[in-house]
């Protein structure tokens, strides 16, 4: 199938969802050569990936992921595509602790740095979290703490076949956008930031196709994959298989304008310090950015009806120490799990 798929895509012909599923299956079962994988990814990039293609790829990837089992329901994920090149601090990771502090179960899917200086796994490690949990440990962490980090390389083993071609061609590929669509705990609700305004409605429709419960796809001012205080954000709400476009301006909710430079991050040590400060109640544009992005997650998880209520609740969760407490609990429990491993040896 992959040979036929390459020929079609090179000719500018879109794949059907079924064809995309079959093609990805060959890739993830090691039946495609590295040259074929590289050719397919490059051709797709040049043609532009469609909703049926991304949906089909994601469906196959979901069948290959090592599933994280949990007793928790109504899971939320804040994993975005990354790749905006802005080198901000880890906004979606900080938001995850606000959501968990509010009582939402958070299955935070992520990886090490791809396009920035510091990925979610990097900053969580710096904060003291043990990120390389087994599927069983991650499920236990979700059950006991209400938040767990799902480290992509340990749970998407079939991705190994595409790793070398992706690295060698050195361009952004469809795999960069498949990560947020393939949460190993099958989170039903998402806040998914994207690096391109053109990609936002595409991924919103893909989420609808995949049966998301309630999710938001965000493309922020200045190309950010988050809502920023610099200006209006393009947001797509996905609910009941319907996609609704909206524009969100933080100023409409009493938040002051701030340049994107106010969100500048650095290495893992710097970003960890910034997150700790925000969760400890430090005021400023970094806090306000976390609050408005977390507010969307609170809506997605069903805790609040609208953005204004979400902002108020996010402020309360931070100011009353619940978000920081959740971070500390995750650090403690993840390290306890490591200790159990050592004791079992």
Swiss-Prot record:
Catalyzes the transfer of the phosphoribosyl group of 5-phosphorylribose-1-pyrophosphate (PRPP) to anthranilate to yield N-(5'-phosphoribosyl)-anthranilate (PRA). Keywords: Amino-acid biosynthesis, Aromatic amino acid biosynthesis, Glycosyltransferase, Magnesium, Metal-binding, Transferase, Tryptophan biosynthesis. GO terms for biological process: L-tryptophan biosynthetic process. It comes from the Bacteria. GO terms for molecular function: anthranilate phosphoribosyltransferase activity; magnesium ion binding. This is Anthranilate phosphoribosyltransferase. Mg(2+) 2 binds at residues 225-226. Anthranilate 1 binds at residues 80, 111. InterPro entries: Anthranilate_Pribosyl_Tfrase, Glycosyl_Trfase_fam3, Glycosyl_Trfase_fam3_N_dom, Glycosyl_Trfase_fam3_N_dom_sf, Nuc_phospho_transferase. Mg(2+) 1 binds at residues 92, 226. Binds 2 magnesium ions per monomer. It catalyses: N-(5-phospho-beta-D-ribosyl)anthranilate + diphosphate = 5-phospho-alpha-D-ribose 1-diphosphate + anthranilate. Pathway: Amino-acid biosynthesis; L-tryptophan biosynthesis; L-tryptophan from chorismate: step 2/5. HAMAP family: TrpD. GO terms for cellular component: cytosol. Belongs to the anthranilate phosphoribosyltransferase family. The keyword Transmembrane helix does not apply. Homodimer. Its cofactor is Mg(2+). Its EC number is 2.4.2.18. The keyword Zinc does not apply. 5-phospho-alpha-D-ribose 1-diphosphate binds at residues 80, 83-84, 88, 90-93, 108-116, 120. It comes from Desulforamulus reducens (strain ATCC BAA-1160 / DSM 100696 / MI-1) (Desulfotomaculum reducens). Anthranilate 2 binds at residue 166.
């Amino acid at each position: 199938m992959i040979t036929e798929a390459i020929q079609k895509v090179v000719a500018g012909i879109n794949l059907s969802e079924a064809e995309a599923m079959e093609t990805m299956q060959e890739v993830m079962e090691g039946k495609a050569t590295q040259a074929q994988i590289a050719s397919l990814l490059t051709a797709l990039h040049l043609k532009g990936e469609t909703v049926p293609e991304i949906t089909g790829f994601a469906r196959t990837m979901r069948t290959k992921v090592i599933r994280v089992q949990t007793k928790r329901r109504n899971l939320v994920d804040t994993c975005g595509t990354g790749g905006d090149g802005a080198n901000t601090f880890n906004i979606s990771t900080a938001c995850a602790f606000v959501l968990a502090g509010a009582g939402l179960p958070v299955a935070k899917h992520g990886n090490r740095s791809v396009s920035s200086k510091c990925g979610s796994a990097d900053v969580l490690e710096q904060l003291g979290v043990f990120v390389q949990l087994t599927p069983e440990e991650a499920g236990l962490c979700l059950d006991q703490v209400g938040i767990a980090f799902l480290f992509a390389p340990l749970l998407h083993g079939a991705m190994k076949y595409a790793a070398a071609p992706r690295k060698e061609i050195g361009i952004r590929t469809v795999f960069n956008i498949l990560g947020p669509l393939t949460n190993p705990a099958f989170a039903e609700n998402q806040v998914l930031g994207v690096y391109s305004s053109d990609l936002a409605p595409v991924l919103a429709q893909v989420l609808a196709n995949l049966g998301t419960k309630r999710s938001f796809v965000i493309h922020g001012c200045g190309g950010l994959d988050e809502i920023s205080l610099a200006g209006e954000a393009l947001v797509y709400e996905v609910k009941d298989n319907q996609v609704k476009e909206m524009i969100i301006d933080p100023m409409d909710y009493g938040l002051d304008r701030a340049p994107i430079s106010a969100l500048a991050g650095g290495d893992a040590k710097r970003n960890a310090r910034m997150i700790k400060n925000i969760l400890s109640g430090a005021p400023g544009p970094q806090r306000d950015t976390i609050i408005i992005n977390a507010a969307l997650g609170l809506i997605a998880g069903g805790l609040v009806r609208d953005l204004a209520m979400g902002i108020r609740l996010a402020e309360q969760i931070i100011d009353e120490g619940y978000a920081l407490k959740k971070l500390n609990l995750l650090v403690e429990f993840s390290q306890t799990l490591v200790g159990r491993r050592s004791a079992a040896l």
